[in-house]
Swiss-Prot record:
Name the UniProt record assigns to this protein: SRY-related protein AES4
A Gene Ontology BP annotation from the UniProt entry: camera-type eye morphogenesis
GO molecular function: DNA-binding transcription activator activity, RNA polymerase II-specific; RNA polymerase II cis-regulatory region sequence-specific DNA binding
DNA-binding region(s), chain positions: 1-69
Keywords: DNA-binding, Nucleus
GO cellular component, one term: nucleus
Length: 72
C-alpha cells in the first residue's frame, strides 16, 4: 500500500505535467529540481489548497487502511 501524497506531491503532480508538455525532452531530475525551487518560492496562501487536499487524502487513507503502518 502506498503512502498518501503530501501537499508538495499533490502540487508537483499537476505542475510536472505542465512542464512536460512545454519541455518534453527535459530530464526528470531537472524537472524535480525546478519543482522544488518553485514550491519553496510559493506563498503559504497559495499552498493552502494543496495542503487541504493532502489532508483529505491522508484521512481517506486512514479510513481505507486503518491498520496501515509505514515501513520503508
Amino acid at each position: 500500500v502506498k503512502r498518501p501524497m503530501n501537499a508538495f506531491m499533490v502540487w508537483s503532480q499537476i505542475e510536472r505535467r505542465k512542464i512536460m508538455e512545454q519541455s518534453p525532452d527535459m530530464h526528470n531530475a531537472e524537472i524535480s529540481k525546478r519543482l522544488g525551487k518553485r514550491w519553496k518560492l510559493l506563498k503559504d496562501s497559495d499552498k493552502i489548497p494543496f495542503i487541504r487536499e493532502a489532508e483529505r487524502l491522508r484521512l481517506k487513507h486512514m479510513a481505507d487502511y486503518p491498520d496501515y503502518k509505514y515501513r520503508p
